[in-house]
From Swiss-Prot:
It is found in: Cytoplasm. Mg(2+) 2 binds at residue 76. This is Crossover junction endodeoxyribonuclease RuvC. GO terms for molecular function: crossover junction DNA endonuclease activity; DNA binding; magnesium ion binding. Binds 2 Mg(2+) ion per subunit.
Length: 174
């Protein structure tokens, strides 16, 4: 007879990177159960030079990491838009968003925006309102102050679901 897996809550930090507003959301996952822990955003002033904005994002995420002590992190991948310069700058913010948790020894998963939407809403082209409606169902205590914080919670939920699925596949030897 096999023993059930030892389920311990895993604290997950989801990050939605951006130069103007980097959203973050922290949840705990235990099996299929999700618990809201906190969310918010890091908002460096637009007047700062790029390097200082990136530093502000790093410092803000470092504070979140210290305050909430997550076990794992997940970051939303960036999409390429028509403005190559904007895409490049967003990529720099994403690099900072991946670096901050890696610097404290966390594994960092990456998820495409369409996968996040499909996981949370069931449709890969869901809009922000649909994501926020599903967040109210999945995390009733969450009241994200911005769409970026809501997106970060969606990234954390996506990671929680994918890690559970991966554990199930591993358990059956697939």
């Amino acid at each position: 007879m096999t023993q059930p897996p030892n389920r311990q809550p895993v604290r997950i930090l989801g990050i939605d990177p951006g130069l103007r507003r980097t959203g973050w959301g922290v949840i705990e996952s235990e099996g299929n159960r999700l618990v809201f822990i906190g969310c918010g955003s890091v908002e460096p002033p637009d007047t700062l030079p790029l390097a200082e904005r990136l530093l502000a994002i790093h410092r803000g995420l470092a504070k979140v990491l210290a305050d909430f002590a997550p076990d794992e992190a997940a970051v939303e991948q960036t999409f390429v838009n028509k403005d190559a310069g904007a895409t490049l700058k967003l990529g720099q913010a994403r690099g900072v968003a991946m670096l901050a948790p890696a610097m404290v020894g966390l594994s960092v998963a990456e998820y495409a925006p369409n996968l996040v939407k499909k996981t949370v809403v069931g449709a890969g082209h869901a809009d922000k309102n649909q994501i926020q409606m599903m967040l109210k169902i999945l995390l009733p205590k969450a009241e994200p102050p911005s769409a970026d914080a809501a997106d970060a919670l969606a990234v954390a939920i996506t990671h929680a679901h994918h890690r559970v699925a991966a554990a199930r596949l591993k358990a059956v030897g697939a």
